[in-house]
Amino acid sequence: MKGHVIISHGLQSSPEATKATAIAKVAQSLGWTTEIPDYRDLDASSELGDVLSRIERLRRALAGKRTPLVLAGSSMGAFISARVSLAVAVQGLFLMAPPTQLKGYDIVLEAAPVRTCIVHGWHDELIPAGEVVRWAQKRSDHLVLVNDSHRLADHVEFCAQEFGRFVQGLA
């Protein structure tokens, strides 16, 4: 099965982010089309950026896309990908370092009941690993915990490889 992947970067990041581009490269090598929306203009508005506008931009990016669709994201990008999956039919979610809640917002991490893979750092200084373990356990999601911090900087290639295994398993 091949389709389209939309990869959402995190706060203080860009479409050229190392994890986003590594995942895009793997997806393309497997025959998937990809896009990485740019949220930098929205992220400059406050400490957490404009979350609701990010969600709306991702929804618009999905309009008219061919299926199957997979959403991937890192940190805030993971959060909005999960939230958008509640409104748009997707085949799967690949979430890296997803926050389970956002300070100052009355929304928590929720996602459609679709195949989901999560990669999270044991030493994440922003989002405690235990919160993500509890969230993933409630959903019986595939969760990989790695010896890394929030940015998963030491596991970029691992994340890309894990993504490749994930999309190859979508059948």
Describe the residue ranges of each PLM region.
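Conserved alpha/beta-hydrolase fold motif
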Residues: 70-71, 93
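Active-site loop->helix "elbow" adjoining a glycine-rich segment at hydrolase catalytic centers
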Residues: 74-78
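Post-His helix in hydrolase/transferase enzymes
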Residues: 21, 153-168
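Conserved alpha/beta-hydrolase "acid-adjacent" motif
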Residues: 16, 125-131
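A conserved short beta-strand
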Residues: 89-101
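Short beta-strand/loop motif that positions the catalytic acidic residue
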Residues: 112, 118-120, 124
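Serine-hydrolase catalytic machinery in alpha/beta-hydrolase-like enzymes
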Residues: 2-68, 80-83
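Catalytic histidine neighborhood in serine/cysteine hydrolases
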Residues: 33-35, 137-152
